[in-house]
Amino acid sequence: MPTDITRRTLLTTAGALALLPAPARSAPLVLTPGQTEGPFYPVALPADADSDLVRVQGAAARALGIVTHVGGRVLDRHGRPVPGAAVEIWQCDAQGIYRHPRAPDQQRFDAGFQGYGRTAVDAGGGYAFRTIRPVPYPGRTPHIHVAVIVPGTGRFVTQMYVEGEPLNARDGLLNSIRDPAARRSVIVPLRPSPAEPGALGGTFDIVLDL
């Protein structure tokens, strides 16, 4: 559960994203490509399932890893915010372990890391999470699973990748996206974040075929 400090940080991040100008209507938007959900979506959602994955209610310490702020906007194909949408993310911990009963080495999962979070978009379509920088594990480049739930439309699933990762060139799922522009749209640069000392930040806008 977020502390007052992290609540302020998340609100600041979300507010900054909401103030970004919407894409010009005449500019062609690249639809975010769908990707597989993967085998480790939570069987049961954690009791603490907010947008701050770095702090778990009752845990003695925060999550291992580099704190990373990930946010953006959920837009339709015309660049308009999608009202009422919710965004979920889930990922492995800093050791490459998922919070899931079938995940390898489950007994070593970092108790200070939520592993899953959910948030509603704001009026501008903005969302924000405080998580950790994704790490590789055997067979996969660093990535974060992302799902968008739109009332009356259904659930859209994709994955976010990190720019500059050497394993990107060999990742089968990333390279299954054949269109270069679509593939680039899910690769996000992570840079020092002004929201928190020592943290990284990246923007991942999600464009739905609506």
Q: What do the predicted segments below correspond to?
A:
Residues 27-187, 191-210:
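Beta-strand-dominated extracellular/periplasmic modules and repeats
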